[in-house]
UniProtKB/Swiss-Prot annotation:
Keywords: Hydrolase. The keyword Hydrolase applies. PANTHER family: ALPHA/BETA HYDROLASE DOMAIN-CONTAINING PROTEIN (PTHR12277), PROTEIN ABHD12B (PTHR12277:SF69). SUPFAM superfamilies: alpha/beta-Hydrolases. The gene is ABHD12B. This is Protein ABHD12B. GO terms for biological process: monoacylglycerol catabolic process; phosphatidylserine catabolic process. It comes from Homo sapiens (Human). It comes from the Eukaryota. One of its GO terms (molecular function) is monoacylglycerol lipase activity. Belongs to the serine esterase family. GO terms for cellular component: endoplasmic reticulum membrane.
Length: 362
């Protein structure tokens, strides 16, 4: 490297801008940002407004409110009592067998078949085939359609099954799709299909033995839906028992304890109605009974706060006015003390049911 090169390499860099120019550039940047800040706020405001609009939009109601309504009406995610092996009913109730019934692809129902107590000794050690054949033994059969939440091992349901079994009835306790260990997702149409499938399966194996659909609370809507479809097919149900029925799901839902507290929120009732319509949750007992001819027994507790007695009375009036044979419709009101789930504790329940069915089936 020669001297000239050394000189060039050692020469200093060109002088930078004066300090005054740096301050001016910095201030210009701050000024631009300050001027843009209102625009940024405006954009943020528009984004928040758009998000709020989407939250209150119909599409979001369909995606959020409808599943919420499903959850509150069916409550099938609450699978109490917990830690129960539904495949082993003998741990909860005697002379009972567990089996599964395929309704359609992806839907398998868990069912407990309890034979009459008088056949308890015969049932010891027997398999499903024996229980199935026992449906022809002449003892009347009840297909039990429970209400929302829990499953077929719920304590109040087991108490009712025991009462009926002691009274000489076969009882098929059904968990709808999505309940207990049954697969699938609950919908009104799906639950109705489940009930029809179990009823027809039972009738195909019962010979001349009568089969009764017994619905409790939500199950009353399932029972009348199924009974109406079977009536239209020319195969009326042998008998129907409705325990704590409502008129329709719209009326029932606005008095449902988990929804009742929201009734005063502006627009809630309209949104609820839209959601029920959109999701086709109707369970129209008040319309269904107008098309039935099967013997119909309505049971209701005087102190039922979940489904008030007035709904049962209203349904009875509608049914009695619609039935040609008035003797086929009866309502029994139970005194205070049994509330919504405990009519099974009434000492008169069994005799009430047996007397009604015996008279209708004689």
């Amino acid at each position: 490297m020669d001297a000239q090169d050394c000189q060039a390499a050692a020469s200093p860099e060109p002088p930078g801008p004066p300090a005054r120019s740096c301050v001016a550039a910095w201030w210009d940047m701050v000024d631009r940002n300050l001027r843009y800040f209102p625009h940024s706020c405006s954009m943020l405001g528009r984004k928040i407004a758009a998000l709020y609009d989407s939250f209150t939009s119909k599409s979001l109601k369909e995606h959020v409110f409808l599943p919420l309504i499903d959850m509150l009406i069916y409550f099938n995610f609450f699978k109490a009592p917990f830690l129960v092996d539904l495949k082993k009913p003998e741990l909860k109730i005697p002379h009972t067998v567990n089996f599964y019934l395929r309704v359609e692809p992806g839907v398998m129902l868990g069912i407990w078949h309890t034979v009459p107590s008088c056949r308890g000794e015969d049932a010891k050690g027997k398999d499903c085939c024996w229980y199935e054949a026992a449906l022809r033994d002449g003892n009347p059969i009840i297909v039990y359609l429970h209400g929302s939440a829990e499953h077929r091992a719920a304590s109040h349901r087991l108490k009712l099954v025991k009462v009926l079994s002691d009274g000489g009835f076969h009882v098929l306790s059904v968990d709808y799709r999505g309940f207990g260990d049954s697969t699938g997702k609950p919908t009104e149409e799906g639950l109705t299909t489940d009930a029809i499938c179990v009823y027809e399966w039972t009738k195909a194996r019962s010979g001349i033995t009568p089969v009764c659909l017994w619905g409790h609370s939500l199950g009353t809507g399932v029972a009348t839906n199924a009974a109406k479809v079977l009536e239209e097919k020319g195969c009326p149900v042998d008998a129907i028992v409705l325990e704590a029925p409502f008129t329709n799901m719209w009326v029932a839902s606005i008095n449902y304890p988990l929804l009742k507290i929201y009734r005063n929120i502006p627009g809630f009732l309209r949104t609820l109605m839209d959601a029920l319509r959109k999701d086709k949750i109707i369970f129209p007992n008040d319309e269904n009974v107008k098309f039935l001819s099967s013997p119909l027994l309505i049971l209701h507790g005087e102190d039922d706060r979940t489904v008030p007695l007035e709904y049962g009375k209203k349904l009875y009036e509608i049914a009695r006015n619609a039935y040609r044979n008035k003797e086929r419709v009866k309502m029994v009101i139970f005194p205070p003390g049994f509330q919504h789930n405990l009519l099974c504790k009434s000492p008169t329940l069994l005799i009430t049911v047996r007397d009604f069915l015996s008279k209708q089936w004689s």
